[in-house]
Design a protein with these regions (language model features):
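N-terminal secretory signal peptides that target proteins for export/translocation
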Residues: 1-22
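Bacterial N-terminal signal peptides
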Residues: 25-37
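Outer-membrane beta-barrel initiation region
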Residues: 43-182, 228-232, 240-244, 254-291, ...
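C-terminal outer-membrane beta-barrel translocator/porin domains of Gram-negative envelope proteins
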Residues: 114-123, 131, 153, 206, ...
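Outer-membrane beta-barrel translocator/channel fold
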Residues: 179-221, 340-359, 436-457
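Internal, well-ordered alpha/beta segment that forms a basic, Gly-enriched binding/recognition surface
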Residues: 214, 218-222, 226-236
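A short, conserved beta-to-alpha structural element at the edge of catalytic cores
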Residues: 421-444
């Protein structure tokens, strides 16, 4: 039951979809991650011929945005040289060699089916250091039973450790409105838990297991530019148990040391019906137009415990605002966003700990931390981000975030309790269901505790939609 949407992960930052080429773009991302690499190399490109001065006039002066580019270039020059010469160029050289050998077309024709290549089965893998990796398959079928009916399936896991899968049916109507039906299930024993509150320590790392089933129906109504309204309903079941991962202690063992108390909802789990509503006002235009604009959004998820005693319910709600500046008109976008998140009980029963506000991981703000690293009743995060195109359907991203979780309605907020999260990586934007990702990130302790780096994340591969 994911209650929030990342300000960056909205359709306006993606390439305009082409139904006849959906399979090609998805497979290109997979092959780029698993075989060829995601970037298009420029190292071996022939030198460009100078443009003749046909008009007899000097070139136009640089724009203010182009003048401002030197600031992030100087600040992030060490990161740039690392990604450019250790990642992009070597991988790009491999891609050029593979294209000369016609490997991409051979693999594309092997993994996709039908005269228009509207269906296919593709192997995927994802590694996120700190949890078990995943291997599996991603299957797609566009216009499956009628035009606009698109099916997506993921089946992933790791031998003797975990297993998960999802099935999505997305129906796109002629008006561009859509209905998504989704069913997912997962069983894995390696979920991290550090306690609840803003001052939890990395040294309190423990593991719990989860069995989860979720079914939902979501309506999406695009509006002006990238604005939209989204509404959905669903049913969620979760059961928890003592977990394991390598030598890390289980949640029950760590709780016995006094590091934290066992959280609400553990180990009994819960079953809940939930309702979700999102409204986003976004002035940005779709690709390939420039990416400047403003986004405001508000969203809420209300959950109701089923057959729970005492009666339980909760409301997760959040608001966010972001400004985006395309510094040169070519999708090199600097953005600043502010986000607040809250979770409130609606009954006499407590909120299950997995329904509290959470920071960390790939979806929530502050990706330099593990998923679920920071949990409590509310959170506030400010994020500065720079995103730029690297190759076809591939963007680079650098971000710095400042924030933390707090008590009810930001109770206990103090500047000294803030943490820093930094991340850099590559990510594809060719599909809403499975994307290539390469991320290197880190997070710190609270400033009152010294602000030292105590969390490191490295992940790469094809996301599995779970």
């Amino acid at each position: 039951m994911e209650a929030h949407e990342d300000l960056e992960d909205v359709p306006v930052t993606t390439r305009a979809p082409r139904r006849s080429k959906a399979a090609r773009s998805m497979l290109a991302a997979v092959l780029g991650a698993c075989v060829l690499g995601p970037a298009v190399a420029r190292a071996d490109d022939p030198p460009r011929r100078p443009l003749p001065d046909y008009a007899g006039r000097p070139p136009p002066p640089p724009t203010p945005g182009q003048d401002l580019l030197w600031v992030p270039r100087v600040i992030f020059s060490p990161v740039y040289f690392t990604t450019e010469f250790l990642i992009r160029r070597p991988i790009g050289a491999l891609e050029i060699a593979a294209e000369r050998a016609n490997i991409p077309n051979t693999l594309y024709n092997f993994f996709t089916f039908g005269p228009e290549h509207k269906s296919g089965i593709v192997p995927i893998a994802f590694v996120d250091f700190g949890v078990n990796p995943s291997l599996g398959v991603y299957a797609f079928w566009d216009d499956a039973f009628f035009k606009g009916d698109n099916l997506r399936m993921h089946f992933v896991g790791w031998p003797d450790e975990w297993l998960g899968g999802s099935i999505v049916q997305r129906i796109v109507f002629p008006s561009k409105d859509s209905l998504q039906l989704k069913l997912l299930g997962i069983r894995r024993p390696d979920q991290p838990f550090f306690g609840i509150g803003p001052s939890t320590l990395q040294s309190s790392l423990s593991r719990y297991g989860i069995d989860k089933v979720d079914g939902s129906a979501t309506f999406d109504f695009p509006m002006w530019r990238a604005s939209k309204v989204e509404a959905g309903v669903g049913v969620h079941y979760a059961e928890f148990y003592d977990g394991h991962y390598h030598s890390d202690p289980g949640i029950e063992e760590e709780a016995r040391t006094g590091a934290f108390a066992l959280p609400d909802g553990y180990p009994g789990g819960y079953t809940a019906e939930y309702n979700h509503l999102l409204f986003a006002l976004d002035s940005r235009r779709p690709f390939p137009e420039e990416g400047s604009g403003v986004r405001l959004d508000a969203q809420a998820t209300q959950g109701n415990g089923i057959a729970s005693s005492p009666a339980s319910g909760w409301l997760r709600w959040q608001g966010s605002a972001g400004g985006f500046l395309d510094v040169d008109g070519h999708r090199r976008v600097v953005s600043l966003s502010l986000q607040t998140l809250f979770a409130d009980p609606l009954g006499s029963g407590p909120i299950p700990f997995t329904e509290l506000v959470s920071l960390g991981g790939d979806v929530a703000p502050m990706p330099g931390f593990y998923q679920g690293r920071l949990i409590d009743r509310s959170a506030a995060v400010a994020t500065l981000r720079y995103r730029w195109p690297v190759g076809p359907f591939i963007d680079g991203s650098m971000q710095a975030a400042l924030g933390n979780v707090f008590g009810e309605h930001l109770e206990g907020f103090e500047p000294g309790l803030l943490r820093f999260s930094g991340a850099i990586g590559l990510e594809s934007d060719s599909s809403p269901d499975s994307n290539f990702q390469l991320l290197v990130g880190f997070g710190t302790e609270t400033f009152d505790h010294g602000g030292q780096i105590d969390s490191f994340r490295l992940s790469f591969g094809i996301s599995n939609g779970l």
